[in-house]
């Protein structure tokens, strides 16, 4: 039999908070102020049943907004409750931004329990903001004291989201981030300045380097110098859109800048490694990961994709062909014709499909590097995978995927059998014949980006232009 929960401390804290806030009204709401602390406590209760944390949640505004002192809380409820209450209290003598900046800086470095108490308060506030904004529209923001109205509140609530990042696995945090998007939209604000010395490199690709933050649960993908901020902005926006489709991907955060490079910030996936890294560390598991990748790709390619949030792969390749300067007008026309004859599909494609762009951790898999995510025919995606598995040279394969070209070819062989549900040699050979022009098309894309490969032009001319 379970022992009954001792609610003595929480009951006492509720009565204390009711008395402290007696006669006060939640500003502009028309109901007693105590409703807010009670809601904050209810939110905290979705994360923990620790009585002292629940007590601190319902008491969080007593020191800041009433005559109650920290010493009163300490004498009545103990040292830990008093400390938790003070951790969620701001300095009323400071200006609007300075006061809130102090709260966020403190929260970012606080213990987990401080953040749990804080999210009860902040989520309750954001719920109220969202409800009132829906009713009042843009005129709602004029009711507040922030010098710059909505701009200040957007800054504040977005920054709070990252100060509370340690709670990213909780339902309360997910609700907070969802309301943040509904209230302020998906737009990326000014880049957040980071000190790259506070980060540890965790991986590198052909145009970006990934880092883990040493003092928190974030990771950043920093693009090479000279890459416009629009590229990481696109990746952040695409990542949010992909997540809304129900596909698993790390939670997207802020646009960042280290003084030389722009980057995209994400919630770090603890214990992560890519399928490529997993194979390099445990070569005996190659078949397991290649099969798993095939099933994940089948799921991806069967997911209906929003034509409003993502670009068509056909439109994308028409643009790439037009941008290329290495081919004549008649050759470009033949390339356009190839793209046009591909049957139309309205499902998701990754755009940069390979075993380095899927992470695994604690039994979960996460799609990453989603800047090229689009909708269209799955053969476009398979062309990229075939190229890196079967066509690329040994050196770039090992540099990016940490396995040999022979192993990479084995990945395709296993993948194709599972993805197409066949072991028939003739059918598999026909699949390779069909996918090679799409691999050549991906080479055309890479060539347009300034990434030249010895096998590139010859493959494009053979597979797409019919030259021997």
Annotated model-derived regions:
Residues 1-188:
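Active-site helical microenvironments for divalent-metal-assisted chemistry
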Residues 188-192, 302-351, 355, 361:
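An alpha-helical support segment within catalytic cores of ATP-dependent transferases
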Residues 208-215, 336-380:
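Active-site acidic catalytic loop and adjacent metal/ATP-binding pocket
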Residues 251-262:
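Short beta-strand micro-motifs within the conserved protein kinase catalytic domain, predominantly
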Residues 264-272:
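Short pocket-lining segment of the protein kinase catalytic domain that shapes the ATP-binding cleft
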Residues 382-423, 438-455:
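Active-site activation/catalytic loop segments of kinase-like enzymes and analogous catalytic loops
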């Amino acid at each position: 039999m379970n022992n009954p929960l001792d609610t003595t401390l929480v009951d006492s804290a509720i009565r204390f908070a009711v008395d402290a806030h007696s006669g006060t009204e939640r500003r502009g709401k028309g109901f007693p102020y105590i409703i807010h602390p009670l809601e904050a406590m209810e939110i905290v209760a979705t994360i923990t049943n620790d009585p002292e944390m629940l007590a601190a949640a319902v008491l969080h505004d007593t020191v800041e907004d009433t005559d109650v002192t920290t010493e009163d809380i300490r004498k009545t409820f103990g040292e830990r409750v008093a400390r938790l209450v003070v951790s969620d209290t701001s300095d009323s003598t400071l200006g609007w931004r300075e006061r809130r900046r102090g709260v966020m800086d403190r929260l970012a470095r606080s213990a987990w329990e401080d953040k749990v108490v804080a999210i009860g308060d902040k989520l309750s506030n954001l719920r109220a903001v969202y409800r009132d904004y829906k009713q009042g529209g843009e005129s709602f923001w004029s009711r507040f004291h922030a010098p710059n109205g909505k701009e200040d509140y957007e800054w504040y609530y977005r920054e709070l989201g990252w100060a509370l990042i340690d709670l990213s696995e909780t339902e309360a945090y997910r609700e907070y981030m969802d309301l943040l998007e509904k209230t302020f939209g998906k737009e990326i604000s000014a880049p957040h300045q980071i000190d790259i010395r506070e980060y540890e490199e965790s991986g590198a690709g052909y145009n970006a380097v990934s880092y883990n933050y040493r003092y928190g649960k974030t990771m950043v993908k920093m693009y090479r110098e000279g890459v416009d901020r629009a590229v990481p902005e696109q990746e952040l926006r695409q990542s949010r859109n992909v997540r809304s489709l129900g596909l698993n991907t790390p939670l997207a955060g802020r646009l960042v800048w280290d003084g030389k490079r722009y980057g995209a910030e994400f919630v770090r996936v603890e214990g992560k490694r890519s399928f490529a890294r997993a194979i390099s560390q445990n070569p005996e598991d190659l078949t397991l990961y290649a099969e798993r990748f095939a099933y994940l790709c089948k799921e991806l390619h069967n997911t209906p994709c929003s034509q409003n949030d993502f670009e068509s792969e056909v439109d994308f390749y028409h643009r790439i062909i037009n941008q290329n300067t290495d081919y004549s007008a008649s050759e470009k026309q033949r390339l356009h014709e190839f793209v046009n004859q591909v049957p139309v599909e309205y499902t998701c494609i990754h755009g940069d499909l390979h075993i380095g762009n899927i992470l695994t951790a604690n039994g979960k898999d996460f799609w990453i590097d989603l800047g090229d995510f689009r909708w269209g025919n799955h053969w476009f995606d398979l062309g990229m995978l075939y190229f890196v598995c079967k066509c690329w040279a040994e050196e770039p394969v090992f540099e990016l995927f940490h396995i040999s070209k022979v192993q990479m070819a084995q990945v395709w062989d296993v993948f194709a059998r599972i993805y197409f549900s066949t072991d028939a040699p003739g059918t598999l050979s026909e699949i390779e014949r069909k996918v090679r022009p799409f691999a050549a098309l991906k080479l055309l894309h890479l060539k347009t980006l300034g990434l030249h490969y010895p096998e590139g032009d010859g493959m494009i001319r053979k597979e797409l232009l019919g030259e021997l």
